[in-house]
């Protein structure tokens, strides 16, 4: 993984937001961290594991290069010698002026949503006999979501408001990043709305939404900086800022979990390794101790890979067998907890075997590279709006690629009704921000 990261980094002109770098950089960190835990967990990866990860990774990388070469061919009618040149095209960025009234109206909506959802979470937790502090109630709701078949929905209105406000966070992050790149100043009201979106994402007890938004935001910042500065490579101080943001996110990960009621007995290093390198160890266990002994196709096609869409269709069509929990057993090694995540390869192997790894990794590479090229290319359609939705869409995909070392984020996230809702919500918020104007009302003395 480290070698593939180095190759992809330099053949992609050191564009750190490109799909191969997004995929291989975190996987490389996970592999390095696994070396640190070899004795602790008594890890001895088998050749089967190495081979499956290598084949899948090469399929992904090959698909990315094919998509890049295809872009060159479609433009010129022939393959150029330098087919790996930068896909980032410079663009004159405009300061996105958001009306103060627009910002305050949206902030008020988010505060109302925060209160409504928090009341609903507390009420549901107490209904199931959970009592205590706010963090205990939120943690209790998270556990109910994970381990009960009872209806614990916040209600259609609350859920839609929750999703809408969370999705708006991507727009607000884009505005903050764009305006900072243009003016070197932080736009305070959009930043306030961004903070509210992050706060709302934590109400259900999960840190995943906040992490998604922050990682996607970093991708937006990088692409916007590169387009604005007309540089393929980031300046050293910009790279340091990206690293600093990553360190802050990682450093506060356990503490945020504790605030949400998720207490762990492990030290910070062990806690982090459970999320970072344990998935590779768990994948090795599955390949050589479960799959190697008795592999059988699941009862539902694409059960693990397309779980979000299948669950939605099952509920919508009233097909009980399509509503299920993921098959992710918790594992331990040498007495240490290794969690229940198995990298992105697990879902493909579980559903379709080695053939699934090859086909789905190729599709992942093609889709992500095409979206990256859309995000980094100026479009005439984008001139109607200052906010480029392609950058936001790719930033969401960037997160799913970056967390492939963890689980099947790509197909879970993209092939889902939730992603379709986000597309609609992003368009709605963009219209509200850029096209809806309010005039201040003045009251004159009669």
Regions found by a protein language model. Give the residues of each.
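A structural signal for hydrophobic alpha-helical transmembrane segments in multi-pass membrane proteins
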Residues: 1-123, 428
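Hydrophobic cores of alpha-helical transmembrane segments in multi-pass inner/ER membrane proteins
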Residues: 1-3, 54-75, 166-175, 214-220, ...
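Hydrophobic, aromatic-rich transmembrane alpha-helices
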Residues: 2-8, 166-181, 359-377
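Conserved luminal/periplasmic juxtamembrane motif of membrane-embedded glycan-processing enzymes
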Residues: 7-8, 13-17, 41-43, 205, ...
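Membrane-interface helix-loop-helix junctions at transmembrane boundaries of multi-pass membrane enzymes
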Residues: 13-18, 174-190, 374-392
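Membrane-embedded catalytic interface detector for glycan/lipid assembly enzymes
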Residues: 75-234, 238-239, 246-260, 443-446
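Small-residue-enriched transmembrane helix-hairpin modules in multi-pass membrane proteins
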Residues: 135-159, 248-368
């Amino acid at each position: 993984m480290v070698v593939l990261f180095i190759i992809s980094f330099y053949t992609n002109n050191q564009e750190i937001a490109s799909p191969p770098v997004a995929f291989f950089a975190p996987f490389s960190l996970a592999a390095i961290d696994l070396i640190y835990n070899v004795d602790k967990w008594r890890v001895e990866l088998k050749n089967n594991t190495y081979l499956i990860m290598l084949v899948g990774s090469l399929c992904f990388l090959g698909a990315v290069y094919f998509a890049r070469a295809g872009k060159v061919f479609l433009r010129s009618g022939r393959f150029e010698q330098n087919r790996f040149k930068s896909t980032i095209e410079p663009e004159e960025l405009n300061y996105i002026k958001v009306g103060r009234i627009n910002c305050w109206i949206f902030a008020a909506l988010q505060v109302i949503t925060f209160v409504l959802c928090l009341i609903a979470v507390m009420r549901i937790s107490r209904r199931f006999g959970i009592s205590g502090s706010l963090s205990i109630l939120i943690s209790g709701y998270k556990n109910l979501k994970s381990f009960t078949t009872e209806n614990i929905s916040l209600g259609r209105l609350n859920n839609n408001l929750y999703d809408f406000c969370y999705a708006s966070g991507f727009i607000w992050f884009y505005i903050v990043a764009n305006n900072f790149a243009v003016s070197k100043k932080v736009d305070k009201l959009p930043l306030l709305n961004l903070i509210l979106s992050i706060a709302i994402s934590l109400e259900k007890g999960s840190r995943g939404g906040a992490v998604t938004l922050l990682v996607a935001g970093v991708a937006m910042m990088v692409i916007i900086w590169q387009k604005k500065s007309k540089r393929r490579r980031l300046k050293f101080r910009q790279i340091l800022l990206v690293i600093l943001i990553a360190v802050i996110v990682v450093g506060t990960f356990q503490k945020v979990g504790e605030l949400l009621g998720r207490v762990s007995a492990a030290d910070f290093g062990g806690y982090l390794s459970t999320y970072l390198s344990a998935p590779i160890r768990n994948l090795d266990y599955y390949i050589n101790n479960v799959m190697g002994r008795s592999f059988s196709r699941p009862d539902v096609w694409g059960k693990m890979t397309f779980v979000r869409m299948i669950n939605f269709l099952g509920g919508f069509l009233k097909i009980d067998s399509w509503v299920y929990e993921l098959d992710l057993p918790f594992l331990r090694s040498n007495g240490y907890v290794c969690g229940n995540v198995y990298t992105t390869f697990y879902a493909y192997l579980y559903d379709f075997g080695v053939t699934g790894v090859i086909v789905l990794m190729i599709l992942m590479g093609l889709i992500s590279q095409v979206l990256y090229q859309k995000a980094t290319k100026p479009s005439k359609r984008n001139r109607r709006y200052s906010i480029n939705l392609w950058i936001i869409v790719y930033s969401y995909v960037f997160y799913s690629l970056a967390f492939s070392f963890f689980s099947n984020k790509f197909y879970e996230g993209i092939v889902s009704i939730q992603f379709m809702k986000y597309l609609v919500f992003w368009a709605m918020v963009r219209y509200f921000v850029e096209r809806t104007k309010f005039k201040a009302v003045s009251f004159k003395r009669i």
